[in-house]
């Protein structure tokens, strides 16, 4: 359902408000470059600093602009189960193809708590759900056994975005539930994950170079592993620089350097340190993206 390349969209700001003009251009560029779908209101989209109203507006705007062109997998997670249900219901109402639900952050629930959180959302709203495991942000790992239990007991939980960084964990999930849609949440691990049965990536770097990320996945799908490996290593330096500071600071800085939108962030995210900015500029020039 959500195979291929999905872009974890940045949320452009101007004067501290969502810049919908720039947003529309970003979405159109993704469509023209051949991605399969977009993911608004995720980690890269600065969802924690969007107001409830903005969160809803961004999701609805993306559905409106992407309709008939590509799928929308909206971020609707929260550390409050009730709030996650609210955003998921909004996504269903406005016509999203599915939702990406991050594990609750800060609360540090047990595995039982995680199971009940996701199951309650799935039982309340009938929409395809992709779990989002990113323990580095949330402080809690969704264990493979919990993923398997949710997949077995909730017909609309169809996949997991894996950003644990552990191929062991990803392999364990696929072993327990071979039919689950296993999606990379880390650009550096897209090719390795594809090789063990993954179906695609929710990419940060595809905000900047969607064509190349699409090429990587399609080349692997065609069976040309040698060429896919070449693309992987070509992209790797840029992938690493996307995390030279906390995401989405680097990717927004790059988007600004390329004239796509402003580099404005909302506190506590802040402007990139100048030495890191210079490293980004050099990498973009080396890659031929900046003169």
Curated annotation (Swiss-Prot):
Record-listed pyruvate binding positions: 44, 202
Localization (cell): Cytoplasm
GO biological process: diaminopimelate biosynthetic process; lysine biosynthetic process via diaminopimelate
PROSITE patterns on file: DHDPS_1
MF (Gene Ontology): 4-hydroxy-tetrahydrodipicolinate synthase activity
Keyword Transferase set for record: no
Gene transcribed to yield this protein: dapA
Part of a proton relay during catalysis, annotated site positions: 43, 106
Keyword Cytoplasm: yes
GO CC terms: cytosol
SMART domains xref list: DHDPS
UniProt keyword list: Amino-acid biosynthesis, Cytoplasm, Diaminopimelate biosynthesis, Lyase, Lysine biosynthesis, Schiff base
EC number(s) on file: 4.3.3.7
Enzyme kind, highest EC tier: lyase
Domain of life of the source: Bacteria
Catalytic residue list: 132, 161
InterPro entries hit by this protein: Aldolase_TIM, DapA, DapA-like, Schiff_base-form_aldolases_CS
Pathway this chain belongs to: Amino-acid biosynthesis; L-lysine biosynthesis via DAP pathway; (S)-tetrahydrodipicolinate from L-aspartate: step 3/4
SUPFAM superfamilies in alphabetical order: Aldolase
Family: Belongs to the DapA family.
Catalytic reaction(s) noted: L-aspartate 4-semialdehyde + pyruvate = (2S,4S)-4-hydroxy-2,3,4,5-tetrahydrodipicolinate + H2O + H(+)
Function: Catalyzes the condensation of (S)-aspartate-beta-semialdehyde [(S)-ASA] and pyruvate to 4-hydroxy-tetrahydrodipicolinate (HTPA).
Assembly and binders: Homotetramer; dimer of dimers.
Listed name of the protein: 4-hydroxy-tetrahydrodipicolinate synthase
Ranges annotated as spanning the membrane: none
Principal subcellular localization: cytoplasm
